Amino acid sequence: MITSIHTLVYSDDAPATRAFLRDVLGWPYVEDAQGGGAGWLIFKSGLSEMGVHPTHSVYDGKTYDSPRHHLISLMCDDISHTVAELKGKGAEFHGEVQAQGWGLMIMMAVPGADDIMLYEPRHPLAYKL
């Protein structure tokens, strides 16, 4: 039986990405000495849920197309508070918080890796099941 989801971030600067997850996001971790020596960290990322979005859809008369891909998003209870807290720890964000139908979102820069979406959901939460 499936017990959890393990996500991977491929980084051009793995030590910087790991430091961001450890020091800025404050995620607890285990060290995997078999994964490549000291500093190979696996993080506890909290509760999770998974949604499946179509690559083509029409909503409110607008057409949306997206290539097949996977996306990592971090959820929070209060996006304004979370953004301010993370900025205080050195996190950088692109643009302003945007209202979407499913929640409030902003893209967060991750050192050495692609951005991660931070959002305050406005949809039912599956991780509480």
Enumerate the predicted regions with their spans.
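Vicinal oxygen chelate
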Residues: 1-5, 28-74, 81-110, 120-129
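Conserved beta-strand-loop-alpha-helix junction that forms the acyl-donor binding cleft
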Residues: 11-13
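Conserved active-site tyrosine of GNAT-family acetyltransferases
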Residues: 17-24, 86, 113
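Short glycine-/small-residue motifs
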Residues: 115-118
